[in-house]
Amino acid sequence: MTGLLKRKFDQLDEDNSSVSSSSSSSGCQSRSCSPSSSVSRAWDSEEEGPWDQMPLPDRDFCGPRSFTPLSILKRARRERPGRVAFDGITVFYFPRCQGFTSVPSRGGCTLGMALRHSACRRFSLAEFAQEQARARHEKLRQRLKEEKLEMLQWKLSAAGVPQAEAGLPPVVDAIDDASVEEDLAVAVAGGRLEEVSFLQPYPARRRRALLRASGVRRIDREEKRELQALRQSREDCGCHCDRICDPETCSCSLAGIKCQMDHTAFPCGCCREGCENPMGRVEFNQARVQTHFIHTLTRLQLEQEAESFRELEAPAQGSPPSPGEEALVPTFPLAKPPMNNELGDNSCSSDMTDSSTASSSASGTSEAPDCPTHPGLPGPGFQPGVDDDSLARILSFSDSDFGGEEEEEEEGSVGNLDNLSCFHPADIFGTSDPGGLASWTHSYSGCSFTSGVLDENANLDASCFLNGGLEGSREGSLPGTSVPPSMDAGRSSSVDLSLSSCDSFELLQALPDYSLGPHYTSQKVSDSLDNIEAPHFPLPGLSPPGDASSCFLESLMGFSEPAAEALDPFIDSQFEDTVPASLMEPVPV
């Protein structure tokens, strides 16, 4: 049904006859047919009509089927004529006269031109180029003649023959042009034709001859004296004072200018000490000029290097830091102190520093079934972050301290520090084990440390660890301790302690289940500590010395008396009389 509504090409052929017989107005209307209709007709022609029915170029283009809009891209650019067009050159000729406007280097006769031109000539562009080439050839020929004449005169003078007897031509014009044609061809081939385009100064005799040739009858002689005075005044520079400059007679002072010295006695003859010119003095300093030059070059190089570094740093800001850059990050950055839930309520605060207790285990080791963990202490897999060690000093002891070596404070050895997993209250205050404190001290001193960092405020003495010696290291573990086979004997531990405060309770406040309440008693301490099971950890075999625990606790608590005498009043009186305090007290840093 749609095919009946569309017009076919055969119907268009019939319409073309009527269109051609119609008026011009109807023919113009056929041009304004829409592109959509022409496209639809083309589709119909592809479906029903053969390709030979397509309109040929020689047909009438006024019909609707020949409508083809021109592409904008194929449209040729219209050439716009230039606004300025040169069709010819007009040359004006001026007669020569005495100038009185310039100062030649020699002589007193200057060249100038009259106010009105004497001739006018018009050339086309090609003709003017030819005229310029001809004038240059003529100038070059004249110069070659002058050179030839000068050469002949020099030969005669060298031979001692007078010019009158030799019969040489007195002027350049007397020389034949044919004699210099060969030299002219060589000069043109050598590029001397371009040298003629530059103006060359004429000597005084040549200037005088040009003026007389142009019709000048009288040459002013006064101009020669004026030009000589001008040249002398320009050559005269500086004052003529002899080492001492008098303001009343100094030419620089009278002229109102400063005295100047480029080198010794030039242009001014006065010295620095004898110059009394009120206007001042200027001296040329080679060292100052060289220094300024070097400083300028250095500044330019620094600016260039900074610019190149900025360009290299800009693309690197978006990329992740390299391992080398991460190693440059400080090991203990300033950060906020950790909260209780992060450290398992094992952190204490003081008025000076923040300390935290953490324990860690070697990666790849699993916890043995017979090694229970305490909820109050961090697990063996706890890894303290960098921010947790913000304002704390790391306290550890190396094996080199056991031999009586000096205490060394090492920076940047956090990777070698071990978490003090053996630090547990059951080993210190255990009631069932009388030697718990000594065993904890001995186990702490016998731990395998590769490097240590001692707190300078702890006042610890390494000599208290010499009693055990190195012989006990071959005996095995301490009595009452078990070493699970699954645990690595080389696993290290460390503790973060701050002993810069003078308070004796800060070390004990870091222990779990320790709270300073109003009804706190020593019995409660014993009961609470008995319920805590001591963790199992590897210990080197050292014989428990008798003085090691007392010396270590004495150094920790800051007591001058022996530890045996100071431990009882410490537990009986100081634990009961302590004011209530929380485990975590925020202290502004």
Curated annotation (Swiss-Prot):
Transcription is among the record's keywords = yes
Gene Ontology MF: a single term: DNA-binding transcription factor activity
What GO terms in the biological process aspect are recorded for it?
apoptotic process; face morphogenesis; platelet-derived growth factor receptor signaling pathway; positive regulation of transcription by RNA polymerase II; post-embryonic development; regulation of transcription by RNA polymerase II; roof of mouth development; skeletal system morphogenesis
Instruction: Tell me, in one coarse class, where this protein mainly resides.
Output: nucleus
> PANTHER family, from UniProt?
CYSTEINE_SERINE-RICH NUCLEAR PROTEIN 1, TGF-BETA INDUCED APOPTOSIS PROTEIN
Q: Name one Pfam family in it.
A: CSRNP_N
**Keyword terms of this UniProt record:** Activator, Apoptosis, DNA-binding, Nucleus, Transcription, Transcription regulation
What is the reported tissue distribution? Ubiquitous. Most abundantly expressed in lung, placenta, skeletal muscle, pancreas and leukocyte. Frequently down-regulated in lung, kidney, liver and colon cancers compared with their corresponding normal tissues.
The organism's superkingdom is given as: Eukaryota
Report the GO terms under cellular component: chromatin; nucleus
Record has Cell inner membrane as a keyword: no
What family is this?
Belongs to the AXUD1 family.
Q: Where is this region: Disordered?
A: 1-62, 309-388
Give the encoding gene's name. CSRNP1
Q: Where is the composition biased (Low complexity)?
A: 17-41, 345-368
Per the entry, what this protein does is: Binds to the consensus sequence 5'-AGAGTG-3' and has transcriptional activator activity. May have a tumor-suppressor function. May play a role in apoptosis.
State the compartments where it is located. Nucleus
Query: This chain belongs to which protein, by name?
Result: Cysteine/serine-rich nuclear protein 1
